[in-house]
Amino acid sequence: MVPEAGRRAIDPRSRANPAGVLLRMGAMSRRVVGAIRLLAGVGLLVTMAIQIADRVVNNVFDPWEYFSYFTIETSLMNIVVFVVGGVLALRRPSDTVLFTTIRMATLAYAIVTAGVYNLLLRDDSPSEGFQALGWPSEVMHVWMPLLIVLDWLVSPGRPALAWRRLGVVMIYPVAWLAYSLLRGAVSNGIYPYPFLDPATDGWGSVIAYIVGLSVGLLALAALAIAYSRRFAGDASLRQS
């Protein structure tokens, strides 16, 4: 029999026990992360609503065009991931493997979106006609990707991912690419981005961009998985 005093002394929840302090700190950190994720999800939703409203007011909103952009579709994913992630962080001590796999994919999408926009598309705005609000685009192409990366790097409760989950990152981009190329072929050359239009520099250029971006996505996903395995922090969260 362990004396009552002894049981209190080794109780991991005890305020005097370092492990208990760490558990409470971890729970508090998860709550902070949960609140930030929920705020980010709501903020991104409001940003998209304002962008759509701006287009509607100026009579330039085309739902088919708007919701065909990679940025818009992945932003919708990010809203869901932020909200679900916020709820998980508030209710669970760690994220699920399925949710973390989805986060890994959306992390790669966010970084590629930011890179493509800032390197290729930032100055590709019309000099005449409708001038869209600038800040919603900055939020979706700059600030949200930065927050998503930060969330991956520092948020507690992220399980390590198995390498076999690497291919998940390509499921959505392959489907989106097939849709975009088919849409361009049947809509008289309407492509969401100029680098996907074969009329610009030919199919060789299109294929080069596709291969390059695919390699980039896989590399980013591999880095995310490697980071999750290196810094899972808890052996119970690791996978083989």
For each predicted feature, which ranges?
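Hydrophobic alpha-helical membrane-insertion segments
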Residues: 110, 166-179
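Non-cytosolic membrane-interface motifs at loop->transmembrane helix junctions
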Residues: 61-69, 98-101, 126-139, 162-166, ...
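Membrane-interface loop-to-helix entry segments
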Residues: 71-74, 134-146, 207-211
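N-terminal membrane topogenic signal
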Residues: 24-40
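Alpha-helical transmembrane segments of multi-pass membrane proteins
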Residues: 40-56
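Juxtamembrane "helix-exit" motif on the non-cytosolic side of transmembrane helices
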Residues: 51-60, 118-128
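Alpha-helical transmembrane segments in multipass membrane proteins, preferentially the mid-helix core
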Residues: 145-161
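Membrane-interface transmembrane-helix boundary segments in multi-pass integral membrane proteins
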Residues: 67-68, 187-223
